Design a protein with these regions (language model features):
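Acidic, glycine-enriched active-site microenvironments
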Residues: 2-118
């Protein structure tokens, strides 16, 4: 590949677990533990949503699986974050190629949605 050629970025993949979380009726710490088992060890952005579908928080990670599982350990979280986790009914994920892509996407999504816990 020459300098003039840039590697193509694959499309951002959005994984939505809302249908699954409705069927198994998990919320908060339990849904986070359940979902984290299926996440890739890749950079990306994650969204936590409430029962009503409101976005509570948007964050980025260089490793989605490792970052998201941290929310399942409530003892290590502030009360504010514990509250956010308890309100979480579903999560959405955007897998990116690089941390820089994740950072840019996170910034754009936060500006657009203005989540309560950001």
């Amino acid at each position: 590949m020459t300098k003039a050629q840039k590697p193509e970025s694959p499309p951002i993949i959005k994984d939505n677990f809302s249908q699954l979380s409705d069927k198994i009726n998990l919320k908060g710490q339990e849904i986070i533990k359940f979902i984290s088992k299926t996440l890739p060890h890749k950079p990306g952005v994650y969204q936590m949503e409430s029962d009503e579908g409101k976005i509570l928080y948007i964050g980025k990670a260089k490793n989605l699986a490792k970052r998201v599982i941290n929310y399942a350990s409530l003892n290590n979280l502030t009360r504010r974050l514990q509250r956010m986790v308890s309100l979480t009914k579903q999560m959405n994920f955007f897998v990116t190629n690089t941390e820089v892509e994740a950072l840019l996407l996170e910034c754009n999504l936060i500006k657009r949605h203005k989540p309560r816990f950001n």
